[in-house]
Design a protein with these regions (language model features):
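Juxtamembrane intracellular "pre-TM" segments in multi-pass secondary transporters
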Residues: 8-18, 202-231
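Residue-level signature of mid-helix packing/kink "hotspots" within the transmembrane helices
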Residues: 40, 68-76, 161, 271-279, ...
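Extracytoplasmic gate region of multi-pass secondary transporters
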Residues: 42-44, 226-278
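Conserved MFS/SLC helix-loop-helix module at the cytosolic interface between two early adjacent transmembrane helices
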Residues: 73-109
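Cytoplasmic helix-loop-helix junction between adjacent transmembrane helices
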Residues: 117-155
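Helix-loop-helix hairpin linking two adjacent transmembrane segments in secondary transporters
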Residues: 151-201
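C-terminal transmembrane helical hairpin of 12-TM major facilitator-type secondary transporters
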Residues: 289-337
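A late C-terminal transmembrane helix in Major Facilitator Superfamily
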Residues: 344-380
Length: 409
């Protein structure tokens, strides 16, 4: 690749001082926003898909969590290759796979085909969610790094909110209430975002690129760090909570009497409420307070779930807002802890991010599946509330240990 067109020479000018880092952040945000749109796009369409394909709640729960299952297998390898191939090509490839996953749902004829198409998202997804922190680690440092993490983390929340609000309100009416055509249009949008990334993104040439360490050696070294192991456990519980509750939230609200359109609006409240906290907290919480902050967010998450499941009216909306503020902040805080661990840094952030998302998405898969299975067994979502509270308490206990560890700056 020609330098200056698709790569950035670190020796000529540090990327952390280049104004182009903000261009990188902008297109990274856009790409991550469409990642969120792709992930959330199926939730507001659960009801027509269930009716059209004659699926059970358990089957739909398995579909909702299927991409996390493939993600688990792909993420560790994806992180290793992101470190090797660079961010420009890797994120472009991931975006193409996501566009295919969403667009091909148009052809789903039953449980099996839909499962395969949603699961394909887990092949491309790791390139985006792991490539994002890798990009920030390369292009930003100091307090700007916390700011950048907060900003790019709002991307999937904007994209997810757009999917929840616009799917039943805009796209479904425009497509004659065809969930198939809705997926097709979303796939085209993601493809256009991928092309924009390809034309504007820049890789960084560093002096460390010549070092070659085997993937097993890198992962073994990372797993020896206690702080990293704690982050992995917290990530496992966090993703189970976030993916489990948010995947089923529109249906939970429909069971409480909301129309599909109103349920989509209400389901976007946590996403929108979390955006201000993402823009502020990652920048201003000092590294030595991140463990305590995780504990506080875990308690707030557990409390908000009970408000959502057990109450109606204004207090339920309070629960949605508190859940958005608390749950949306967990992953950025864990990412910063991981990124600033001395054994990780920018050099191994791809591999460390792959390890983090590999473990975390086990929870991301089990969350929607277990909540769907609990509905089949109990006839309601209350049992899932007990599960979410238990996981939140697990985060509380584990996050308190992070404060005792030294976090590298």
């Amino acid at each position: 690749m020609k330098e200056g067109s698709s790569s950035f020479n670190e020796s000529a000018r540090g990327p952390q001082s280049s104004p182009y880092r903000w261009v990188m952040l902008a297109i990274l945000w856009l790409l991550y926003a469409f990642f969120g749109l792709a992930y959330r796009s199926i939730s507001p369409l659960v009801t027509p898909i269930l009716e059209d394909l004659n699926m059970s709640y358990g089957q739909m729960g398995f579909v909702l969590g299927s991409w996390q299952l493939t993600y688990i297998g792909a993420s560790t390898v994806a992180g290793f290759f992101i470190d090797r191939w660079g961010i420009r090509w890797s994120l472009f490839f991931g975006s193409l796979i996501i566009a295919l996953s969403v667009g091909l749902r148009y052809f789903a004829a039953g449980f099996g085909p839909l499962l395969a198409m949603v699961a394909l998202f887990g092949v491309g997804g790791p390139m985006i969610s792991i490539g994002c922190p890798k990009t920030i680690a390369l292009w930003f440092q100091g307090r700007d790094r916390g700011t950048a993490v907060g900003i790019y983390s709002t991307g999937p929340f904007f994209g997810g909110a757009l999917a929840l609000i616009a799917t039943n309100r805009v796209l479904m009416p425009l497509t004659g209430h065809s969930w198939r055509l809705t997926f097709a249009w979303y796939g085209i949008m993601i493809l256009l975002a991928a092309c924009l990334w390809w034309f504007l993104a820049r890789d960084i040439t560093t002096s460390e690129a010549s070092e070659r360490t085997g993937m097993k050696g890198i992962l073994a070294t990372l797993l020896k760090v206690r702080n990293i192991r704690i982050v992995l456990v917290c990530g496992l519980f966090t993703f189970a909570i976030i993916h489990g509750l948010t995947s089923w939230l529109p249906r939970i609200l429909e069971d409480q009497g909301f129309s599909p359109t109103l349920a989509g609006y209400a389901s976007s409240v946590p996403l929108l409420a979390g955006i201000p906290s993402l823009l502020v907290l990652p920048r201003f919480i000092p590294s030595e307070r991140r463990g305590l902050s995780l504990a506080v967010m875990a308690v707030l998450s557990a409390s908000s779930v009970w408000l959502i499941l057990c109450l109606t009216g204004p207090l339920m909306y309070v629960g949605l807002i508190v859940y958005g503020i608390a749950a949306c902040t967990l992953v950025p805080l864990l990412t910063l802890i991981l990124m600033e661990t001395p054994e990780v840094g920018a050099k191994h952030m791809g591999s460390a991010g792959g390890l983090f998302f590999c473990v975390s998405e086990i929870g991301g898969f089990m969350g929607p599946f277990m909540l769907g299975a609990l509905v089949d067994w109990t006839g309601g979502f209350l049992a899932g509330g007990y599960l979410v509270v238990a996981l939140s308490l697990g985060i509380l206990l584990m996050s308190l240990l992070i404060e005792k560890q030294a976090v590298g700056e």
